[in-house]
C-alpha cells in the first residue's frame, strides 16, 4: 500500500516539475529518478474512492523539488492508473526546483491542480512563478505540458503582471554560442 501511495505522490511531484518548466528552463535532469519523500501531520486513504489525502504541513521532496502545502489530495478516478488528479492547497501552497542551468524556479498559489491524463496544470488564487528576477503573476496560470503553452489570467478589474529581466533573455538566446559568436551578434 505504501508503494501505491508513493506512486500517486510521484504524480504530484511530476506536476510541480512540469509546472516549473513553464518558465523557459529545463529541470534538473535526474529529479524524477530520485526517491519521493512525503511528510505530513496526517495521512488517510479511501481505497474504494481511490483517494489519498495528506494534511497538516505537507512536505513533498524529490531531488531538488520541494512542495509545501496545507493539504494534498490525490484522486485516481475509476482506479485507472495514468488518470490521476492531484490537488494541493495552502496559504499559499509553494514549490521550489533547481534547474540544470543552476537557476531556481519558485512558485506559489492557493491551489495547485494537475490532471495527469491531459498533462494540464492550473495554479489558482494569487498564482505566481519566478525564475531569478523574472516572474509572472495573476489569479490563474494554466499550462499544457506537452504543448508547452502557458496562459495567465486575472479576475475582473485586475491585470496579469510579468517582469522579464533582459540579461536572462539574452542568456537563453545566446545558449551554446562561444564568446566570439556572442560579440559578433
Swiss-Prot record:
GO cellular component, one term: cell outer membrane
HAMAP family from the UniProt entry: LPS_assembly_LptA (MF_01914)
Family: Belongs to the LptA family.
Superkingdom assignment: Bacteria
Protein name: Lipopolysaccharide export system protein LptA
Swiss-Prot/TrEMBL domain comment: The N-terminal domain interacts with LptC, at the inner membrane, and the C-terminal domain interacts with LptD, at the outer membrane.
Molecular function terms, GO-annotated: glycolipid transfer activity; identical protein binding; lipopolysaccharide binding
Coiled coil start-end: none
Listed result of changing residue 76 to D/E: No change in activity
NCBIfam families reported in the protein's UniProt record: outer_YhbN_LptA, PRK10894.1
Keywords on record: Periplasm, Signal, Transport
Gene name of this polypeptide: lptA
Chain intervals for the UniProt region annotation (Disordered): 166-185
Function: Involved in the assembly of lipopolysaccharide (LPS). Required for the translocation of LPS from the inner membrane to the outer membrane. May form a bridge between the inner membrane and the outer membrane, via interactions with LptC and LptD, thereby facilitating LPS transfer across the periplasm.
Induction per the UniProt record: Transcriptionally regulated by sigma-E factor.
Assembly: Component of the lipopolysaccharide transport and assembly complex. Can form head-to-tail homodimers and oligomers. Interacts with LptC, LptD and with the lipid A domain of LPS.
Reported effect, residue 38 to E: No change in activity
Effect of residue 138 to R: Cannot complement E.coli lptA-depleted mutants. Exhibits lower thermal stability. Has a lower propensity to oligomerize
Any one GO BP annotation for this protein: lipopolysaccharide transport
Signal peptide: 1-27
Disruption phenotype: Results in an earlier growth arrest and onset of cell lethality.
Lineage of source species: Bacteria, Pseudomonadati, Pseudomonadota, Gammaproteobacteria, Enterobacterales
